[in-house]
Amino acid sequence: MKTITTFENKKVLVLGLARSGEAAARLLAKLGAIVTVNDGKPFDENPTAQSLLEEGIKVVCGSHPLELLDEDFCYMIKNPGIPYNNPMVKKALEKQIPVLTEVELAYLVSESQLIGITGSNGKTTTTTMIAEVLNAGGQRGLLAGNIGFPASEVVQAANDKDTLVMELSSFQLMGVKEFRPHIAVITNLMPTHLDYHGSFEDYVAAKWNIQNQMSSSDFLVLNFNQGISKELAKTTKATIVPFSTTEKVDGAYVQDKQLFYKGENIMSVDDIGVPGSHNVENALATIAVAKLAGISNQVIRETLSNFGGVKHRLQSLGKVHGISFYNDSKSTNILATQKALSGFDNTKVILIAGGLDRGNEFDELIPDITGLKHMVVLGESASRVKRAAQKAGVTYSDALDVRDAVHKAYEVAQQGDVILLSPANASWDMYKNFEVRGDEFIDTFESLRGE
């Protein structure tokens, strides 16, 4: 970590705690700042705030009082989940207080090379793939950012020989100014988080901030399956490295079920350790980054062949009596489930689907579920999912929860079949989040394996 004096003896307000806010507050204190933390959660229910107070950091909890900004703050560090139309943020900007993101703070003190990964889908898997390939190739890739390791925490233990492999959300990229990765990846761009950004155009603009400070000596890896990426490529100073599953490009591409990089045959599609067309795209993006980082083809091939996936993202759990189990609880929308199903022979798949009812029908899913061996349906949206199953001519059964669904799927499964949890729905009707839902699937699998 670099020693900088930017924040020394400067009053800094950290707005919003969670893990990134806590990490930012501790880093700022280490840099000599006079830190105040403001979090909406009441102090007596806020162990993080209590811990920071014990360390001498001022905390204001339970509300976001605008008068707090009457103090002469030199900077605000904003939690990424807090929108820019938040009254505290608006007042800070009106007072011309610079509003920084936590990843920008980390960047300012980093002496490590930075690889930044963003996009609508596939960020976590691609970030993990890249880190694993770098580490297998003898480099030290440190996971950071939206993947669960706050950048401002990771950066404190990193040095100039390390590479930060940073997953970045659109929330984190909004408002970055100096942030400059040496290699950036945009996996894909889909209409999402529009409630936060207001429009698809504003969402794309936030993602595109990743390349604002890049030059021709930096590399931007883009998905040329998408026309929008091809158009955006014309507007950056960075050197473009495209990847595509549909055409031969001057980067990473698929030809005759083989993955190539600029004419070099790297590996077979069938050897990628995780199934699904989306994971072919993730592997291509990883190959592009790995080649730019000087990793050998053998290391790339071995790492991607042995890659077991990321928890809750088409995660291969193993087999019970020849029946394979895949946990794709992160599939909270139709598109994600479509991509998951693309990696399997439908005639051998028992799909567990359903969850929070957002009022949408599932007709888009009909071509993808046609031919499934069976479906097990659960949650608020069960009636809508069942209508799609009926139209697709797929048999189905009802389940009370994920545990019940696994047992019902197991009853109809035979050796060689696949039990796939890919709900196409959010989890909040029955579970706190998709992780809890996925953990119940894993626990039930472990119980079956132990019988």
Swiss-Prot record:
Secretion signal span: none
The keyword Cell wall biogenesis/degradation belongs to this UniProt entry's keyword annotation: yes
Pfam families to which the protein is assigned, alphabetical: Mur_ligase_C (PF02875), Mur_ligase_M (PF08245), MurD-like_N (PF21799)
Record keyword Membrane present: no
Biological or metabolic pathway of the protein: Cell wall biogenesis; peptidoglycan biosynthesis
Keywords: ATP-binding, Cell cycle, Cell division, Cell shape, Cell wall biogenesis/degradation, Cytoplasm, Ligase, Nucleotide-binding, Peptidoglycan synthesis
EC number: 6.3.2.9
Xref: InterPro entries: Mur-like_cat_sf (IPR036565), Mur_ligase_C (IPR004101), Mur_ligase_C_dom_sf (IPR036615), Mur_ligase_cen (IPR013221), MurD (IPR005762)
Record organism: Streptococcus agalactiae serotype V (strain ATCC BAA-611 / 2603 V/R)
Subcellular location: Cytoplasm
Function as written in the Swiss-Prot or TrEMBL entry: Cell wall formation. Catalyzes the addition of glutamate to the nucleotide precursor UDP-N-acetylmuramoyl-L-alanine (UMA).
Record protein name field: UDP-N-acetylmuramoylalanine--D-glutamate ligase
High-level lineage: Bacteria, Bacillati, Bacillota, Bacilli, Lactobacillales
UniProt GO BP: cell division; cell wall organization; peptidoglycan biosynthetic process; regulation of cell shape
Principal location class: cytoplasm
Catalytic activity: UDP-N-acetyl-alpha-D-muramoyl-L-alanine + D-glutamate + ATP = UDP-N-acetyl-alpha-D-muramoyl-L-alanyl-D-glutamate + ADP + phosphate + H(+)
Similarity comment: Belongs to the MurCDEF family.
